[in-house]
Every structure is written in structure tokens, then in C-alpha cells.
Amino acid sequence: MTIDQDMSIDDEISEESIYKLKESVDTAPKLELIVKESLFLEENLKIKINALGLEESSKKELNGKTYFGLPSPVDEKINKKIDFPTGNNDIINTNSDIHYGVQFRIKFDINEYCYYIKDCSYGRGYGTFMKVINSMKIRDNMLINIGNNYLVITFGVDDSEPEENNTIDENQKILSIKVFGGDLVNYSYVFNANQVNKILIGKDEKCNVVLIDELLDDVHCMIEFKNNKGWILYDGYENKNSENGTWVSLAEDTQIYDGMLIQSNQNIYLCHLIENQQ
């Protein structure tokens, strides 16, 4: 599927749904994205979104979806899709168009009465991530960013175990970590919860996964296996959060909560939900 095809599918919404969105503007919660760190945007700038989309949008018709991204120097079709420009592509890389286009999308779900966010970069640029606050359950094919490193987490079969022992539950106990970026490229670690149920990741030699990166804490994050819960990702170690955070890709639609931190294209946004008083 091409990027254009996927984006057109994401745009499909019925007239009935748009009518419901319009009716919900005065009662639905509003969302503010507050710029906390940026190379391009004013600090503490508030980007206001309601059930229909970006407030003060230049679009004539809103459909409950707001697209953030970098305008293209050559592709007006992409530019028309972007509701909020997140910077100047010339500043990022004057010799490449890899960063331009839609970076992420926020939509209001009329049935659940809440906002969802999804990365729409499709491998272009830096991607869109949310900061782990305390802990998060790991899912298969999860992408994690810590410092200059990207970790792809997958579940799998342990070839050292007899085939009859590789049940669905047992497969969930096998965790593979593939490292990209930094000093390690395409380097993989495999852990079996029956042997190691706590995995320390950081730059200290005591860690199970050692990454040479000055942006990391000695123990930057931890992955722990818990019975009946599976693998859990924790930011920091021993009740102390990491300095630069542990970030998880928003490759799937994820519900936005008050206080959520989002990182995209070297911008960090704080999400603030405002309940409507009407």
C-alpha cells in the first residue's frame, strides 16, 4: 500500500459522522498540545483542538482529524493535507526531502468521546513517540527509543526448548531485542523469562543490554516479566526515572490522556485535556 492510498483511507468519514462531530463540539472535551521543547516552534505555544479538528484551521471542511507535519517544497497535495506545520524543512535538512510530509494524526472518536493519536511518518523522519510514565505493557513488534538507540521488541520461539514446550504462553516468555542506531547495528538479544525475568538496559556494564550512549543513564530502563501480565517496560530503575526518558512508538492508534508527552520531529508536546463545562 502506498502512502497516498493509506492516507486516503484514513480520510474516509461519513456525512452522518461529521454531523455528529459538529453537534459534539460544545460538549466534547477539548485538547491542547503545549510545545515544551522545539527547534522550530515557540515554547509554550498552545495548539487547540476540538471534536471537529484544529481550531482556527484554514481548511474549509473539518472531519475530526488533525494532521501535523512539515510542508513539502514540491508536493502541494501533501501540503493541503497538513493542518499544523511543525517546522521548516529547510532548517532540518536542505539536501533531503526525507522529513517532509505528515508526521502524526490526532482524531476525535465520537463513540468513545476521546482523542487518539497515531504516527503517520511511514518510516520518514524521526517518527512519533510517547513518553513512558512509570510503566507500560510491551506488545509484539513494539519500537522503543532511548537516547540515540532504537529497540525493536518481538516475541518468539526459543529454539533451545523442546517443540512441545513452545506453547502460545511459552512463546510470550521469549523476548527478542534488536538494536538499531548508536554503536550497535542490527544486534539482537534473546531472553527467556524462565531464565531471566528482569532485563536491565543502559550504559552500565551490569546491564543485560549494554549501550554506549552518553544520553543514557547507567540503568536507563528495565523490562520485567510478570506472570499473568507478560513483559512490562519501566522507565528508569529503583524508583528513579531516567533523565532523557523512555519513548514508545505510536505506530498504532493510542488514546490520549491528560499529561501525556509526545515527541515528533524534534518537538515535544504536553497533552492537556479540558473537560467542556456545558
Give the positions of each predicted feature.
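Regulatory inter-domain linker segments that are low-complexity and enriched
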Residues: 1-45, 149-217, 224-229, 265-278
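Forkhead-associated
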Residues: 55-140, 193-265
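Internal, hydrophobic cores of structured domains that mediate oligomerization or house catalytic pockets
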Residues: 144-146
